Regions:
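Active-site acidic/histidine proton-transfer and metal-coordination neighborhood
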Residues: 5-9, 47-51, 67-173, 183
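Flexible, glycine- and charge-enriched loops at secondary-structure boundaries
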Residues: 34-41, 74-78, 113-120, 153, ...
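Active-site-proximal loop/turn and secondary-structure-junction residues that shape catalytic pockets
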Residues: 1, 26-28, 61-64, 106-108, ...
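Conserved alpha-helical segments that form or flank metal/cofactor-binding pockets of metalloenzymes
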Residues: 47, 55-58
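Residue-level detector of anion-binding/catalytic polar loops
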Residues: 20-21, 54, 98, 140, ...
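Histidine-acidic metal/acid-base catalytic patches
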Residues: 1-18, 42, 49, 96, ...
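Glycine-rich, proline-tolerant flexible connector loops at the mouths of alpha/beta enzymes
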Residues: 25-48, 104, 111
């Protein structure tokens, strides 16, 4: 959200507003994750600690990269992507993050002529192959179901849970995103949340269908907060937005006001 601020400035703003952690999109640091220098990684750790925060982890993992794709039938591209996940895990570990949110809708969508089963097999192999390294690094990989307007692969939380169960590794879990759950239509967002055990959730994004933060649109967070409490989820609720006007600080302030109102 704070793409135009330095990382240290972002941490300072987040801390002053009452946030407890920050998520990092790798492309905001360098063109590729392996381009983030050791000095940058050290400065990230220092900026986070200086402001009394924690690094939650990484998201938007493949955003603004080229030649990478999770379900591609192209063997060369597939191998590059597998290797790149190892690079991302190293980055997440180095900045002391614990989760990697696998959204990247365009880089996972099935290509023309590819069946769902073929794409599924590719995804299972991709993520299963990364899980042991993630475990060693103390990182949990989180598959993020996304709406059909964004991708044609893994659109529902039920599909995300199915993938999680097939991979069957403690460091691979499902990610919940309010905007994406709203896109499912039915069941309701609270009922989708209730369909998931807290121990199967790796991370949780809060936002609105209008692409702003929680409380800035039509989604009612009262029933969502109740469902979150019912299943016993007591870890991160992380603000993710896609519109930045009037300005990121205002959005961050309004978002945390909503979270405090319903979740405190």
């Amino acid at each position: 959200m704070f793409e135009k601020n330095s990382f240290r400035e972002t941490c300072e703003i987040a801390s002053k507003l009452g946030y407890q952690g920050v998520e990092i999109a790798p492309y905001t640091l360098a063109a590729t994750a392996d381009g983030v220098t050791a000095e940058q990684r050290a400065e990230i750790r220092k900026a986070v600690k200086d402001n009394g925060l924690q690094t939650v982890g990484l998201h938007w993992l493949l955003a603004k990269t080229t030649g990478l794709h999770i379900t591609t039938p192209d063997d060369s591209m597939y191998r590059r992507t597998k290797d790149y996940f190892n690079v991302l895990i190293d980055l997440c570990h180095d900045v002391e993050g614990n989760v990697m949110v696998i959204g990247s809708p365009k880089q996972r969508s099935l290509v023309d002529g590819q069946s769902y089963e073929q794409g599924w097999k590719r995804a299972v192999e991709m993520f299963r192959g990364a899980c042991d390294k993630a475990s060693d690094a103390g990182v949990t990989l989180c598959i993020e179901p996304l709406g059909k307007t964004e991708t044609n692969f893994i659109n529902t939380v039920a599909e995300g849970l199915k993938l999680m169960r097939e991979i069957n590794h403690p460091n691979f879990k499902v990610h919940l995103d309010v905007k994406a759950m709203a896109a499912e239509g039915k069941p309701s967002i609270p009922d989708i949340i209730r369909s998931v055990r807290a121990q199967d959730i790796g991370h949780f994004h809060v936002n609105d269908s209008n692409l702003y933060g929680p409380g800035m649109g039509a989604i009612d967070y009262g029933p969502i907060a109740l469902a979150v409490r019912e299943i016993g989820w007591n870890k991160w609720l992380s603000v993710e937005v896609f519109k930045f006007d009037p300005d990121p600080t205002t959005i961050a302030r309004k978002s945390i006001e909503c979270l405090k109102r319903y979740f405190s």
